[in-house]
Structures are given as structure tokens and as C-alpha cells.
Amino acid sequence: MSAARPQFSIDDAFELTLEDAGPEPESSGVARFGPLHFERRARFEVADEDKQSRLRYQNLENDEDGAQASPEPDGGVSTRDSGHMSVRSSQWSFSTISSSTQRSYNACCSWTQHPLIQKNRRVVLASFLLLLLGLVLILVGVGLEVAPSPGVSSAIFFVPGILLLVPGVYHVIFIYCAVKGRRGFQFFYLPYFEK
């Protein structure tokens, strides 16, 4: 009943045949759909590409001094250190761990060097001030609950503390995530930030 029809896959939806392409198809018979071109690749090509990207990442981890690295058949990485070859495994040495710790410490505080943070220093400081004042007022309220004082209610400190803490936490977290480039966080959404 049914002739041997080729199976349709999602990749076929992105390819234009000669009759779909219009008056000027490309010479290969498959027209490009705008700037994107989808083509099928064999599984071994994808696996080979994945292996190369892992080796590139491994080389970035292992080569702190910028030496050239090439993959070795046994899975290690060889580097050229002033003329002689040495093979290192992918395990980190103590010096690599300490230098990566130093880099992570610098990366932790590097968000303060962002140009928009420097330009809007007052807004950032006000956000931290809201956070700290809110924490202090809440802690004073907790202290009054633990050791009550006659004539002073802890609610006087809790309510303003929460009212200051919530926007302070929101702005500090939002600014930090925007500097780090997290998806959905942009300085454009903070009305007091000058762009």
C-alpha cells in the first residue's frame, strides 16, 4: 500500500528543496534559510567535536603559564616547557589550586570594578545601606523581644527593619546578578541606574 516513503525529521523542516527555494536556488540544491544553515552531521563528527572541546577546556585548566598543549594518546596533556616535553594528567597540583583560589577571590570582588557600578556608586551604596539598616533594626527588635524594656515595643523596630531590608536585599542581589551577566538581570530594569 504505502511506498517506501522516507522518514520526516525536524531537520527536514529547515531545508528548502529546489522547488521551495524560488527563482534563485543555491548550486548545492539546498537553499539557506536566512543567515542560518542546518545540516546533518554524522554522530562520529559530533563526538569528535565534543572531545576536542573537552581537550581545549582541559588545556585551559592545566596551562597556567600559557604553554602550548596537544592531546596525547593516553589521555594526558603534553606541554612544551622550554624545549622538553612533559606529560601531566588532568589532576590539579597544589599550585593550580592555590592560583585558582586566588582568581576566585579576585573574581568575587571584581564586580565592584564594573563601569556601571563605578558610575552609579551612590545607588549601590544606598542599596547596601538599606540592607544594613534593615538588618540592624531587625536585630534590635529581636533584642527587645529577648530582653523586653518597659514602654518600648519591638514592633517599632521590626516593621521599619523589614521595610528597609526587603528592597535592600532585592537591589543588592539584582545588581550582583546583573554584573555577573545572569539571564533576566539587566541594569536597564533598575530605574535609578544611569546607563
From Swiss-Prot:
Q: Write out the annotated subcellular location.
A: Membrane; Cytoplasm, Perinuclear region
User: Where primarily located?
Assistant: membrane
> Which keywords describe this protein according to UniProt?
Cytoplasm, Membrane, Phosphoprotein, Transmembrane, Transmembrane helix
What does UniProt give as GO cellular component? Answer: cytosol; membrane; perinuclear region of cytoplasm
Composition skew (Acidic residues), residue ranges: 14-23
Task: List all topological domains (Cytoplasmic).
Answer: 1-122, 176-195
Q: Which residues lie on this side of the membrane: Extracellular?
A: 144-154
The membrane spanning regions, by residue number, are 123-143, 155-175
Origin: domain of life: Eukaryota
Give a Pfam family name: TMEM_230_134
Name of the featured protein? Transmembrane protein 134
Taxonomic source organism: Mus musculus (Mouse)
- What gene, per UniProt, encodes this protein? Tmem134
